[in-house]
Amino acid sequence: MVDIDTGWGGSEEISNTIAEMENAGVAAVHIEDQVYDKRCGHRPNKQIVSVAEMQDRLKAAVDAKKDESFFIMARTDALASEGIEKAIERCGEYLKVGADGIFFEAALSLDEYKEFKKNFSFPLLANITEFGKTPLFTQKELSDVGVDIVLYPLTAFRAMSLSAEKIYNSIIKDGTQEPLLDIMQTREELYEVLDYYNFEKQLDEQFENNNKESS
């Protein structure tokens, strides 16, 4: 699932974005109802567009997709400014124009997710990002109130960022990375994750075939 923010422009840009995502093999996107100059969903003073404008964004996305299985998630940031009831009303309007599911941003409690599922049977996404407004609910807690998809958007990034900071500070201090080797992923482990040897084998076969054809 790719975050396309507010769609990166008007209807034409949204259509182009969806086409590019499908061509790249993306399975799903989420598009939101903040104004174009948006901010982080867990920061104060967010501003949202009208229901009609968000519906136009969704219509452009839905009309542009060629693959029926391509999933378009409508994200709403309305909870902070309009409250749970208005946010749920908005979601109903988004689903009417073809959204496949709802991304309910910056929920404060499990009851808010439960309230949503009382109204709709469509898939519901919970964004469980660290250090934000939403508590770090467990997968079981979320499943029990009807959440279908859980997003951990920055979990690995935050760990990697802190690790990188510590590593480069260590190199500055010691002048070498040698003391850090035991906490690193080895070349062999990386190749295994990437299935690199299989790729290399295919590349060798391709070169061999090309050489045969040219000789």
Q: What does each of the following model-derived ranges do?
A:
Residues 1-152, 158, 162, 166-169, ...:
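Alpha/beta enzyme core
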Residues 157-215:
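Extended, intrinsically disordered, low-complexity segments
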